[in-house]
């Protein structure tokens, strides 16, 4: 499909700089064949803090469990599915925790190296540092707290065909976004030509929006916005969006025909083969029950709900639209709705 059919508005100028900006949508497939191009992935896992929230005190955002796997492992799986086998993960003081979690997650991650930005470098600085010594023709950078459901191959095609220095994935409700009036919301996914990073300072905090893009404009380099439908990239920015992402992932799994290793499907629910769920338990909607968990008699699980490993749901309890992490115990007759219960949490019995 030709770019003009997909909504590319070539030559739309930036009034301030005069640089070329184009718009491409995420539907369909490009005719450009990037075979033979070496592509390297960069995951930006050193995300900004939420503030002094409860979840932040428990775990860094890329390690939040989504379907009982770290959020960042879903990002890495997306890169691997798109054909990227080498990834550099950029983190901060959470590097050791992320390395340990990914080693135990059992997910389909590509080969990973780590870059620890002890001093804050910002996203552009981290990407430049991660690319040092790389022979890649293309760099795909993605935040570590998103779940993309877009065709990575088509995104790379669009970037290469446009000869852009930088491509930003944005979400828009319009089929053909108007860059001047509706530029779309950035989704935390970028495709770089390596030479676009030449002007990024090797020291200090370097941002993409505030520093790199204006610099590319000044140099007359082309920037492409690649528009995808709203909801095709799920971002986790806080507790509410975390619950929404967990529910989205479970609903998406339920609607797909894919199998999940170690789990058996019961209606809309997924039960681990080592989980013990009493026959009298009522399952309503998509429910995900992890390894070695026990759900006792006459309980009710209403989806979308995820239950981690080694949890115990005592008799007559009700768990609805919630995310329970590992080792949680819910007392007999307790009622949970729209809740997050962290590792080893205890919910007392109900009346």
Where are the predicted features?
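N-terminal glycine-rich phosphate-binding loop and ensuing alpha1 helix
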Residues: 2-4, 10, 14-99, 110
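Glycine-rich hexapeptide-repeat left-handed beta-helix
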Residues: 3, 10-19, 23, 46, ...
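Generic beta-sheet signal
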Residues: 44, 66, 90, 117, ...
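Well-ordered alpha-helical segments embedded in enzymatic catalytic cores
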Residues: 71-75, 125-129, 212
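Conserved beta-loop-beta/alpha segment of the NTase-like Rossmann-fold superfamily
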Residues: 89, 96-179
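Catalytic-core segments of class I nucleotidyltransferases/pyrophosphorylases
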Residues: 138-140, 147-148, 153-160, 167, ...
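Extended, small-residue-rich solenoid/repeat segments and analogous flexible loops
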Residues: 217-311, 318
């Amino acid at each position: 499909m030709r770019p003009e059919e997909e909504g590319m508005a070539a030559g739309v100028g930036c009034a301030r700089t005069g640089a070329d900006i184009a718009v491409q949508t995420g539907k369909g497939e490009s005719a450009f064949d990037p075979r033979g191009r070496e592509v390297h992935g960069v995951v930006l896992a050193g995300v900004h803090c939420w503030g002094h929230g409860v979840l932040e005190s428990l775990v860094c955002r890329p390690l939040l469990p989504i379907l009982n796997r770290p959020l960042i492992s879903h990002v890495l799986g997306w890169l691997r599915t798109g054909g990227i086998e080498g990834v550099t993960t950029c983190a901060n003081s959470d590097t050791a925790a992320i390395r340990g979690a990914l080693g135990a997650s059992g997910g389909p991650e590509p080969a990973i190296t780590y870059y620890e930005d002890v001093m804050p470098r910002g996203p552009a600085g981290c990407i430049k540092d991660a690319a040092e010594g790389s022979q890649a023709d293309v760099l795909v950078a993605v935040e570590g707290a998103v779940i993309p459901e877009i065709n990575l191959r088509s995104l790379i095609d669009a970037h290469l065909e446009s000869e852009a220095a930088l491509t930003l994935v944005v979400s828009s409700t319009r089929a053909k976004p108007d860059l001047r009036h509706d530029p779309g919301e950035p989704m935390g996914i970028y495709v770089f030509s390596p030479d676009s990073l030449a002007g990024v300072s090797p020291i200090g905090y370097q941002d993409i929006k505030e520093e790199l893009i204006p610099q590319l404009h000044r140099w007359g380099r082309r920037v492409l916005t690649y528009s995808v439908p709203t909801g095709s990239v799920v971002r986790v920015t806080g507790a509410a969006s975390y619950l929404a992402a967990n529910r989205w992932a479970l609903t998406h799994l339920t609607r797909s025909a894919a199998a999940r290793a170690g789990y058996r499907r019961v209606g809309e629910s997924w039960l681990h083969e080592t989980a013990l769920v009493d026959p009298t338990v009522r399952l309503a909607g998509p429910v995900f029950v992890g390894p070695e968990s026990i759900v006792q008699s006459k309980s009710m699980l209403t989806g979308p709900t995820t239950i981690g490993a080694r949890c115990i749901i005592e008799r007559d309890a009700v768990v609805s639209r919630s995310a329970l992490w590992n080792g949680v115990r819910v007392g007999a007759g307790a009622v949970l709705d729209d809740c997050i219960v962290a590792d080893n949490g205890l919910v007392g019995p109900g009346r």
